[in-house]
C-alpha cells in the first residue's frame, strides 16, 4: 500500500478565531479528539492544537486527507462543509517544509516566538503515548526539532523575539499608558501567563493577581512575581478589583460570562476595564464588548501589533528558509532510502532468480563444466544483472526525490515484484 506524508490544518491566516475555537482539538476536549490517530487507514499521526493553529500530521494512503477531515468535523459535531473552506492540505515535501517552518516559528503570528517549539514537543509526546507516532513521524519530528535549533543558532530570528503575551501587554500599555497605577489579573498559569506576568511587571503594574484551576500553580507563579494567588472559584469576585485581565487558559468553553461582568460594573462605578483574551477556544464571552466601559480584545486583534516584528525579521527568515531547504533534502534522502530499499532489493532478486534459472538450464544442455568456467559464467551474469538493473534503479532514485510512490508501484507491476516471497521487508511508508 502506498503511503504518503500529509499535513492538514487551519491557522490564523485561514480561519478567524470564531472558526478556530469551533475546531480546536485541546487536551480538555473529548478523548475522541485524540482517537483521530487511531482511525483505520492512517498509519501514523500527530495533532498540534494551539491558539493560532490546529494541524494534523499523518502518514497514510491517498484517502488520508478525506478521512482526517471527516473525523475532525465529526468529533467537533460540525459538518465537513463548515470545516473544509478554512483548511489547507500539504503532501510529501510540501508537508515536511510546512512542519519545519512551524517548528522554526516562521509560520507564527509573531515571527521568531519561542513557544511553538515547546507546543510541538508536547504534541509529539502525546502522539508517542497514544502509539500514533512511529518510524516515519518519529524521525520527522526529531528532524523538525533539530531544524528549529539550527535556525535559532545560525540566524537572529529569535533575537529579542516577542510573544503573544508581549503583544497583549503592549496593547494594554497603548490603551492605559503608564501602568503603575493599575491592577492586573492573569487567568491561567502556563507559559503564556508567565510571560505576560514578566512583561506586566516590567511595565510597572501596581498589583498582580493570578487565577488558575490548580491553586498550587497559581501560588507558584504568584511567588515569582510578587503577586497574589486567587482560587479559581473566586475569580468573578476578584474581577471587580482589577483594571486589566489577560486570560490564557486551555478551557474548552467560556469561563467569564456576560452577566459576570455586567454585575461587577456598578461595584467599580463603571470605571473602564480591559480584557485581553488570548485563549482558543476563548475564555471570555465575546458579547462582553457590548457593555459600556468594557474593552475586549482577542488574539486576532493582536495582529497589527506584531506586524513591525515581522518586518524586522524578514531578512533572518530568508536565511532560515535556506536552512530548512537543506534539511528537507536530508530528510527526504532518508525517507527515499526507507521507501525504495524493498523495491531495489526485490528488483535485484527478480533478475538474479531469472539469471540463476537460465544458467542452470544452460549448464544442463552443455553438460558438466569445470569450476573455473562456472565461476566465470557466474561473474558474467552478476555483471549483466548490475548493468540491467542500473538504469531502472537510477530512475527510481531520481524520480523518488518528489516523495511520490506512484513510480514505485509502476516498477513493481512492470517487473511483477509483488509475487516475490518477502522476508524481513523494510517499512514501505512515505
From Swiss-Prot:
NADP(+) binds at residues 188-193. Pfam families: GlutR_dimer, GlutR_N, Shikimate_DH. It is an enzyme of class 1 (oxidoreductase). The active site is at 51 (nucleophile). One of its GO terms (molecular function) is glutamyl-tRNA reductase activity. Substrate binds at residues 50-53, 108, 113-115, 119. Pathway: Porphyrin-containing compound metabolism; protoporphyrin-IX biosynthesis; 5-aminolevulinate from L-glutamyl-tRNA(Glu): step 1/2. Keywords: NADP, Oxidoreductase, Porphyrin biosynthesis. SUPFAM superfamilies: Glutamyl tRNA-reductase catalytic, N-terminal domain, Glutamyl tRNA-reductase dimerization domain, NAD(P)-binding Rossmann-fold domains. The record marks 98 as: Important for activity. Its EC number is 1.2.1.70. InterPro entries: 4pyrrol_synth_GluRdtase, 4pyrrol_synth_GluRdtase_dimer, 4pyrrol_synth_GluRdtase_N, GluRdtase_CS, GluRdtase_dimer_dom_sf, GluRdtase_N_sf, NAD(P)-bd_dom_sf, Shikm_DH/Glu-tRNA_Rdtase. It catalyses: (S)-4-amino-5-oxopentanoate + tRNA(Glu) + NADP(+) = L-glutamyl-tRNA(Glu) + NADPH + H(+). It comes from the Bacteria. GO terms for biological process: protoporphyrinogen IX biosynthetic process from glutamate. HAMAP family: Glu_tRNA_reductase (MF_00087). Homodimer. During catalysis, the active site Cys acts as a nucleophile attacking the alpha-carbonyl group of tRNA-bound glutamate with the formation of a thioester intermediate between enzyme and glutamate, and the concomitant release of tRNA(Glu). The thioester intermediate is finally reduced by direct hydride transfer from NADPH, to form the product GSA. Belongs to the glutamyl-tRNA reductase family. Possesses an unusual extended V-shaped dimeric structure with each monomer consisting of three distinct domains arranged along a curved 'spinal' alpha-helix. The N-terminal catalytic domain specifically recognizes the glutamate moiety of the substrate. The second domain is the NADPH-binding domain, and the third C-terminal domain is responsible for dimerization. NCBIfam families: hemA (TIGR01035). Catalyzes the NADPH-dependent reduction of glutamyl-tRNA(Glu) to glutamate 1-semialdehyde (GSA). This is Glutamyl-tRNA reductase. It comes from Lawsonia intracellularis (strain PHE/MN1-00). The lineage of its organism: Bacteria, Pseudomonadati, Thermodesulfobacteriota, Desulfovibrionia, Desulfovibrionales. The gene is hemA.
